[in-house]
Amino acid sequence: EIAQCLVGSEMCIRDRNTADRSIALMDTAIRRRFQFIEMMPDSDVLRKIHADKVENLDVAAVLDKINERITFLYDREHTIGHAFFTGLKDDASLAKLQSIFEKSVIPLLQEYFYEDYQKIQFVLGDNAKSDDSLKFILDEKVVAKNIFKGNVEDVIDLPEKRYSINKVAFSNINSYKEIL
């Protein structure tokens, strides 16, 4: 249908998230009819459009570090795209960065890592932060026998930690600096 409406000199540009497998059949059909050009996240785009700084934080470097860690822990298909951060061009505020992380980055990481918060902590550098107020994801040791009655030591795979999102960290520029 799309190909029939295009004149010889026109191009059809489509983007897609390669991690989204819900459209696999449609994707296969489109791949047979069109050329694909891979476009991975590119922090230089943020630098070129001046969307790479919030206060004295190098947002492009933060994106690179997050994506390096995601690639190591998962794969390159689940890296965070630079497009999430392009809004910083018009509003280079901490509040805008906070919104990007709270509404886009954290939910994607939760989905990608199936809510394995320890891996999310690694991606965000929380595992190396000594100040809990700077951690995006907090962890608290859980003692099963304090929660359940009876003998729980024999039960396999009980969690040893409970995780929570630390809303305070999102409004502190140092939380982002310590990702690096």
Where are these regions (language model features)?
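Single conserved hydrophobic/aromatic residue that forms the stacking wall/gate
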Residues: 1-8, 13
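A general structural signal for short secondary-structure junctions and capping/turn motifs
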Residues: 4, 27-29, 69-77, 154-155
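Short glycine-/polar-rich loops that comprise or flank the Walker A/P-loop
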Residues: 9-10, 30-35, 80
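A short beta-strand-to-loop transition that corresponds to the Sensor-1 phosphate-sensing loop
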Residues: 14-20, 40-42
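Switch/connector loops and helix/strand junctions flanking conserved nucleotide-binding motifs
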Residues: 21-26, 45-49
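Conserved AAA+ ATPase small/helical "lid" subdomain
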Residues: 47-137, 141
